[in-house]
Design a protein with these regions (language model features):
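Residue-level signature of outer-membrane beta-barrel architecture
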Residues: 8, 31-32, 43, 106-108, ...
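Extended, hydrophobic alpha-helical segments in both membrane/secreted and soluble proteins
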Residues: 25-27, 118, 157-159, 224-230, ...
Length: 262
């Protein structure tokens, strides 16, 4: 069996510069190799193209109606002491977001109620952001811009053993035990530029006269878990549950990396 789906979402904002387009694709399939053996794949991919509005209807409603939008020279009037809602629509703030999520798994029925499942999952995301503020919005009459790049990846490897047993319909036992490995890494870079030659070359940060600031970030984390759960149902009226897990995480303190959680 298999499933394939495609979807498109397109939204035009009520304010200039605020629109969103998203494209999604999904693939899901499962194959019965043997009566006791199954393999499957689930994958989701998406692309988001988003322009973030830098003004709102509230700012337009709050703008004094007796103040001019343009001065006598036909330029935006920035001398009123109030943010010009029309001028602010010329700010640029654009996102490109790519996401891929997928899982590959296998299941095998071992013997009389015992089932083993192993799965490998991945999550990958790329984000690009470009912003630009024209010179007429600056008190120093200088255009400024920035670029931001973000990458995130996560891998999860799960292995579980399930057991289900029913006796005389009055006793039902359901148990699971397993181990899990998880790894996540993120990287980011941001650069800010000042004094562009004009308001049209906003997509090229290298055209700025100076790089006012820059920075990058890196973060990595890991998690190892072993866990177990037992559910016992008596006469379809009473349910008893016993759980426990033992986790080791790089997010814990260096002197206490592991902990038991009943």
């Amino acid at each position: 069996k298999y499933l394939i789906s495609l979807s498109v979402f397109d939204q035009q904002g009520m304010v200039k510069g605020g629109d969103l387009s998203r494209y999604n694709a999904r693939v899901s399939t499962e194959m019965n190799v043997l009566p006791i053996l199954r393999f499957g794949i689930n994958a989701n991919m998406s692309y988001t193209d988003q322009n973030n509005a830098n003004t709102s209807l509230f700012s337009a409603q709050g703008f004094r109606p007796d103040l001019p939008i343009y001065n006598d020279n036909g330029e935006f009037d920035m001398s009123t002491g109030q943010a010009n809602p029309v001028a602010n629509t010329y700010k640029k703030n654009h996102d490109n977001i790519y996401r891929i999520m997928g899982t590959v798994y296998g299941e095998v029925d071992i013997w009389k109620g015992f089932r083993f499942r192993s799965s490998l999952s991945g999550n990958l995301q790329f984000t690009e952001n470009n912003s630009f503020s024209p010179s007429f919005l600056s008190t120093r009459n200088e255009a400024s811009g920035s670029e931001y790049h973000y990458k995130y990846s996560k891998t999860v490897f799960d292995n579980t053993l399930n057991y289900n047993y029913e006796f005389n319909k009055n006793h039902v036992l359901d148990a699971v035990a397993g181990i899990s490995f998880e790894r996540g890494i993120s990287r980011s870079t941001r650069m800010n530029g000042q004094t562009y030659p004009d308001n049209d070359i906003y997509t090229n940060l290298g055209s700025a006269a100076s790089i006012s600031s820059w920075g990058n970030g890196y973060n990595a984390s890991g998690l190892f878990s072993s866990f177990a759960r037992i559910n016992y149902k008596l006469m379809e009226r009473y349910l008893f549950t016993f759980t426990g897990r033992y986790d080791g995480s790089s997010m814990f303190g260096s002197n206490n990396r592991y902990g038991f959680f009943p």
